[in-house]
């Protein structure tokens, strides 16, 4: 039997790390195959990997941000590859720079249509924003876990702000429980 938790899919994981030294981005972008650097448009080097599919932003300060990965494991694998590629250029990268997950964006479904007006009234104005003229989704800010859930009339949800994949499951369970309490879910 499938559960609503089975509808959760990680769409994007963003993580950061630090190489611990300043980098010459002009040289780095020349030496890293496929790297892009247009300082007039963006202050960092964009280094894309096909496997795992991701983009790593490398800044002069040595800070790096990996985005586009579909799992926390993929982020670690991607940054491991990036660190290895940078080491091969003769740049000293510590063996295991700490990697910190900043944001996980997940999608999920309640598998039924939602009356967002009724939900906005039921949940109260303290934790929600709903202005359908501005944005078609209802923004629901949770405290535990500390995430934001976007609810759409289709029953689809986007859960963002988490730093652990389990937080999406906790958020979905919370939303399901609250809407059931309010009599707004079948």
Swiss-Prot record:
Matching InterPro entries: TBP, TBP_archaea, TBP_CS, TBP_dom_sf
SUPFAM superfamilies recorded for this chain? TATA-box binding protein-like
The segments carrying the sequence repeats are: 10-86, 101-179
Q: Give yes or no: UniProt keyword Ribonucleoprotein.
A: no
Q: What would be one Pfam family of this protein? A: TBP
Q: Which GO terms describe its molecular function?
A: DNA binding; DNA-binding transcription factor activity; general transcription initiation factor activity
User: What keywords is this UniProt entry annotated with?
Assistant: DNA-binding, Plasmid, Repeat, Transcription, Transcription regulation
Q: Which CDD domains match?
A: TBP_archaea
Protein's GO biological process: DNA-templated transcription initiation
Could you say which protein family the record assigns here? Answer: Belongs to the TBP family.
Q: Function of this protein?
A: General factor that plays a role in the activation of archaeal genes transcribed by RNA polymerase. Binds specifically to the TATA box promoter element which lies close to the position of transcription initiation.
According to UniProt, the name of this protein is TATA-box-binding protein B
Species assigned in the record: Halobacterium salinarum (strain ATCC 700922 / JCM 11081 / NRC-1) (Halobacterium halobium)
The beginning of the lineage is:
Archaea, Methanobacteriati, Methanobacteriota, Stenosarchaea group, Halobacteria
């Amino acid at each position: 039997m499938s559960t609503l938790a089975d509808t959760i899919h990680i769409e994007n994981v963003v993580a950061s790390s630090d190489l611990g030294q300043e980098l010459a981005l002009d040289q780095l972008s020349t030496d890293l195959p496929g790297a892009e650097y247009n300082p007039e448009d963006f202050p960092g080097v964009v280094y894309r990997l096909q496997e795992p599919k991701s983009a790593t932003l490398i800044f002069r300060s040595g800070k790096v941000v990996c985005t586009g990965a579909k799992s926390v494991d993929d982020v670690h694998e991607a940054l491991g590859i990036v660190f290895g590629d940078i080491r091969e250029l003769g740049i000293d990268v510590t063996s295991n720079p700490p990697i910190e997950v900043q944001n996980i964006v997940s999608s999920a479904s309640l598998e039924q249509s939602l009356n967002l007006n009724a939900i906005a009234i039921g949940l109260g104005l303290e934790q929600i924003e709903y202005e359908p003229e501005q944005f078609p989704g209802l923004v629901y800010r949770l405290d535990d876990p500390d995430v934001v859930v976007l609810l759409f009339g289709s029953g689809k949800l986007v859960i963002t702000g988490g730093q652990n994949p389990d937080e999406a499951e906790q958020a979905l369970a919370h939303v399901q429980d609250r809407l059931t309490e309010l009599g707004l879910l079948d």
